[in-house]
């Protein structure tokens, strides 16, 4: 008789990082979690991945464009010699994803964001909203990752128009 085996759907995702950090992650099979109070921390504390390798390269370039202008790196080619892209296969389980492509999830996000703005008296970062959802409200038990479409290549302040979107994952 045939077993009703549910196969998991694994997909390759990409993470841009400094070469030494990447080597260490490959050796230990552990990627250090990103935790930051900076505005660039879009999706809260966690591990960041892109669906397309080119977006990981673009992230490296965009994040370090100012260093190129300051001559810390002679040019974008030199910059890419200091960084690497890691590929990671992750199981795709849509029921465990919190995403702005799901109308109910987006409404929850907007409601919590508005409440945090009301409580704090100023705009909040998207990462602050996700940290609140996952750490305070307990969404960590229900969801494994955030799949969020983010604008790329521009200095962004929230709220912003969602143009030039790229999907980014935070686990």
Regions found by a protein language model. Give the residues of each.
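Generic detector of solvent-exposed, compositionally biased contiguous segments
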Residues: 1, 71, 148-149
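ADP-ribose/NAD+-binding catalytic cleft of ART/PARP-like enzymes
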Residues: 1-42
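Extracellular structured ligand-interaction cores
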Residues: 11, 44-47, 83-87
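Short, flexible loop/turn elements at secondary-structure junctions
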Residues: 13-21, 49-54, 89-94
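Extended catalytic/binding region for NAD+/ADP-ribose chemistry, centered on the ART fold
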Residues: 36-66
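Short, solvent-exposed secondary-structure capping/transition elements
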Residues: 56-62, 69-70, 96-101
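Cytochrome P450 catalytic domain signature, combining two hallmark sequence patches
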Residues: 64-84
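Active-site and NAD+-binding cores of ADP-ribose-processing enzymes
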Residues: 82-171
């Amino acid at each position: 008789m045939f077993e009703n085996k549910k196969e998991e759907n694994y997909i390759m995702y990409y993470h841009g990082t400094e070469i030494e950090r990447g080597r260490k992650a490959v050796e230990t099979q552990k990627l250090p979690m990103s935790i930051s109070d900076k505005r660039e921390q879009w999706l809260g504390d966690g591990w960041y991945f892109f669906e397309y390798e080119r977006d990981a390269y673009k992230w490296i370039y965009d994040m370090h464009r100012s260093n190129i202008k300051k001559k810390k790196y002679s040019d974008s080619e030199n910059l890419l010699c200091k960084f690497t892209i890691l590929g990671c296969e992750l199981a795709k389980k849509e029921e465990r994803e919190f995403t702005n492509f799901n109308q109910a999830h987006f409404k929850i996000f907007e409601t919590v964001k508005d409440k945090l703005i009301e409580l704090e008296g100023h705009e909040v970062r998207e990462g602050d909203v996700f940290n609140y959802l996952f750490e305070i409200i307990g969404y960590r038990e229900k969801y494994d990752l955030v799949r969020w479409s983010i604008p790329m290549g521009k200095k962004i302040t929230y709220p912003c128009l969602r143009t030039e979107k790229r999907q980014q994952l935070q686990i």
